[in-house]
Structure formats: structure tokens, C-alpha cells
């Protein structure tokens, strides 16, 4: 009986360690968490926000969610059109995967004809190691 319990605990430990659960990395210097940004929004200004990528390739848009401190930010990497018709260049997400911790450099949008309040338009994505 004791061996079975030890074996079961060993299997459970291996499962937990290999499940892909990645602890939140230390907050990068100069970057805001999603909560910090949404509690004190800074619109149309270049800022850095960090968080975990989720829903990449799962949404009906060229966007993903960035999550930190239990809040999500809607991050757009393509199809970014200003009210005056100016099209922003797309940013590659080929090296980014769901579950990656990243820093995004870009702008929080205040809402317009082609975008919603608190959409984040990214200019650069950097994976946090």
C-alpha cells in the first residue's frame, strides 16, 4: 500500500511539473502590468506592458490576450487602422506562443472608428526569459 501511494505521488509530481505551468517571471524594469495600465490608462503614448500570451490564433482577429495580475489586455498585431485611414505595419508573432511571457511595446487606444477603448496596438514583442 505504501509503495502505491509513493508511486501515485511520484506520478502526480511529474504530471504537475510537465504540465507547462510557468510561474510569473519577475516584473521587467520599466514595464507596466495589465492591471497597472488599465487602472491608470495612458492613451496614444508608447508604453511597455508585460504579461502572458493567450488565445493567440484562437480569436477571430489578428490579436491575442495579454494577461498579468489576473487581467487581460486585447493586443492587436495587424489590421491596425487609424481614423484618418493610416494603416499601421503588422508585427510578426511567428516566434510567440500561448503561454509565453512577453513585453509588448505599443499604444493603448482610447477608441475610434476602427478600434475600441483599451485596444492595445503593438509595435514590438519581446519574449521574457
Language model regions located:
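Sec-dependent bacterial lipoprotein signal peptides
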Residues: 1-19
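OB-fold and OB-like single-stranded nucleic-acid-recognition modules
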Residues: 16-129
